[in-house]
Structure formats: structure tokens, C-alpha cells
């Protein structure tokens, strides 16, 4: 099968790698234009751009697909299907319909739960116990297309965002190959109208701890928002970012936000948050033992 691949970040790399090493032929790769990075502001190609270059796949970097030029470009590429994974641009209907098998997408959540821009982060932030990877036939809606293949899995209690990212990227790549091999036999399954949720992009403001929340909820945020935007609190007008934590459901009578002992354990609306790794603004990352050597605070103090 001849494939146009559309993707940009590391999440899309396992799928393109699988396709390159399969009996299919990737005839073109579309990705976000190179971006200026670093002190010298040199242009850096996306991970998909770099991989496609290595595999000698023609690469296209339009700034939009919503014009006649992009439509003509895609129409003139001889392909059977378009695979879209974290591309970063909306795909207009004329391109969704441009090829025989339309456009397929890998979505890392249990659709229709966590449609939208941040499914991986929200899966962890919401404390989900299970998740899925779906191969979806794209339509004009936001992650509303029929499901062609799906695999469910349990989530370890301490799973990090990077671990979930890697698992879904690799599992999605495997499911994509299986889907392409059986595409003429698969009966598309419409998504349920129940249990629909949408995820928006994270903001820096969401990372600030609300100590009225449960310790469980705050710990989920720590795992789901690392590295960005990061979960943080204020102490003596300084920002401290929590990079790793554990929690206890132990009952207490402290006001939420109270530092209850010299190990920097903090009372929450329910339970206690035990910080294990953190970073003070302008300082390097420290584990809790290293941090406490230079951190003097009386017990029964408040953070914000």
C-alpha cells in the first residue's frame, strides 16, 4: 500500500519507523516546518522530518492544508491512504476524502473519552485506571471518527507521562500495521455517544497546586504535567516545582497547605503529599534529601 504520512513529534516516530520497515511504501511525509531553536536560533527539523530524510522519503512542510495549493499537492501524489499522527494541522474535508482509504489516525485514549489536544496528560491527571490506543478513521469532527482497531490496557499507579507516551506510541504503531493488513475486512465501529470528554491544551496556570485538592489528585497532576507545564507552589515568594511525589490518604486536622513535618510533607484537602524530587526557581533539580539540607523551615508553616 502506498502511504502519505503526516506527523511531527516523537510520538509519531515509532509508526513511521514501522511503516518504513514494512512491505508498504511511504511515498511522502508531511510535517510542521522547521522551527528556530537554541541561542543561535538555528532551524531544527521535526523528528518526523529527520526520520523521513534518513529514509529518503520526500518531505513537505506547508504552513497550512487549507488552500488550493496543498490540495493539489496531495491530489497529485499517488497514494492509497493518508496516516495522520500528531501532525499539528487541521485536515480539511477535501483532503480527508482525497485517497481511496481516507485518513487514519492513532489516538492515545479510550475514545470517546479524552478527545482533543492532551489525551495523554488528561489520562494521568484524571487518575484513570485503564486506557486505550485507537486506530480511527478520521472525519470532520474532533476525534469523532469510527474506530477500526483498539487495544485496552491497565495503567500502573505510578505511571509517568513519558512512560504512557512511549507505550501508546509503540502500541499505536503495532496496531496501525495490523489495521493496514486487514483494512478491507475491518468493520468500522462508530463511537459511543456516552462518556464523551474533551481535553484542552494545558496552561501554566493549571500547574499551580490547590492544596484544597486531595493528595491523590495533586500527585496525579505531578505525573501528568511533567515536564510541562509542571506542578508548582509558592513558599516565601519563591516558586518551587514538584517533579516527583507520593501520597498518603492518612486523615489529619491540619489546614491544607500546612508543612506538617521536617520532611516537607504537606497537608492537602484529603491526605498528605510527600514530595520526593523538586526544583526551586533558578536552581537545579534535587531529590528531597538534598533539598532539605539547605531548607530551614519550622514545622506548622504554610505554602501557597
UniProtKB/Swiss-Prot annotation:
Return the SUPFAM superfamilies for the record: FMT C-terminal domain-like, Formyltransferase
Catalytic activity, EC? 2.1.2.9
**Keywords per UniProt:** Protein biosynthesis, Transferase
* Broad class of enzyme this protein falls into: transferase
The residues that cross the membrane are none
Mind naming one GO cellular-component term on file for this protein? cytosol
Q: Which reaction does it catalyse?
A: L-methionyl-tRNA(fMet) + (6R)-10-formyltetrahydrofolate = N-formyl-L-methionyl-tRNA(fMet) + (6S)-5,6,7,8-tetrahydrofolate + H(+)
This protein's source sits in the domain of life called Bacteria
Which Pfam family name is an example for this entry? Formyl_trans_C
Q: Does the keyword Nucleus apply?
A: no
**Amino acids binding (6S)-5,6,7,8-tetrahydrofolate:** 109-112
> What role does this protein play?
Attaches a formyl group to the free amino group of methionyl-tRNA(fMet). The formyl group appears to play a dual role in the initiator identity of N-formylmethionyl-tRNA by promoting its recognition by IF2 and preventing the misappropriation of this tRNA by the elongation apparatus.
Q: Which family does it belong to?
A: Belongs to the Fmt family.
What is this protein's name? Answer: Methionyl-tRNA formyltransferase
Which species does the entry assign this protein to? Answer: Rickettsia bellii (strain RML369-C)
Amino acid at each position: 500500500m502506498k502511504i502519505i504520512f503526516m506527523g511531527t513529534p516523537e510520538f509519531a516516530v515509532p509508526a513511521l519507523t514501522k511503516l518504513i520497515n514494512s512491505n508498504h511504501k511511504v511515498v511522502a511525509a508531511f510535517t510542521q516546518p522547521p522551527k528556530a531553536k537554541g541561542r543561535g536560533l538555528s532551524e531544527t527539523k521535526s523528528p518526523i522530518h529527520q526520520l523521513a530524510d534518513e529514509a529518503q522519503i520526500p518531505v513537505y512542510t506547508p504552513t497550512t492544508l487549507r488552500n488550493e495549493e496543498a490540495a493539489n499537492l496531495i491530489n497529485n501524489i499517488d497514494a492509497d491512504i493518508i496516516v495522520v499522527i500528531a501532525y499539528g494541522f487541521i485536515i480539511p474535508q477535501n483532503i480527508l476524502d482525497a485517497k481511496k482509504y481516507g485518513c487514519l489516525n492513532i489516538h492515545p485514549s479510550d475514545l470517546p473519552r479524552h478527545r482533543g489536544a492532551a489525551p495523554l496528560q488528561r489520562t494521568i491527571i484524571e487518575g484513570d485506571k485503564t486506557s486505550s490506543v485507537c486506530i480511527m478513521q478520521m472525519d470532520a469532527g474532533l476525534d469523532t471518527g469510527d474506530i477500526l482497531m483498539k487495544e485496552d490496557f491497565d495503567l500502573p499507579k505510578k505511571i509517568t507521562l513519558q512512560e504512557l507516551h512511549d507505550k501508546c506510541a509503540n502500541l499505536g504503531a503495532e496496531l496501525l500495521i495490523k489495521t493496514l493488513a486487514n483494512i478491507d475486512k475491518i468493520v468500522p465501529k462508530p463511537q459511543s455517544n456516552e462518556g464523551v470528554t474533551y481535553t484542552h491544551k494545558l496552561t501554566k496556570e493549571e500547574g499551580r497546586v490547590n492544596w484544597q485538592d486531595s493528595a491523590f489528585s495533586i500527585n496525579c497532576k505531578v505525573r501528568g504535567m511533567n515536564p510541562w507545564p509542571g506542578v508548582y507552589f509558592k513558599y516565601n515568594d519563591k516558586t518551587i516545582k514538584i517533579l516527583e511525589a507520593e501520597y498518603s490518604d492518612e486523615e489529619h486536622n491540619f489546614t491544607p497547605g500546612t508543612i506538617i513535618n521536617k520532611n516537607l510533607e504537606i497537608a492537602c484537602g484529603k491526605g498528605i503529599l510527600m514530595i520526593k524530587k523538586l526544583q526551586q526557581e533558578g536552581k537545579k533539580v534535587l531529590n528531597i534529601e538534598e533539598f532539605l539540607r539547605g531548607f530551614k523551615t519550622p514545622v506548622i508553616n504554610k505554602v501557597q
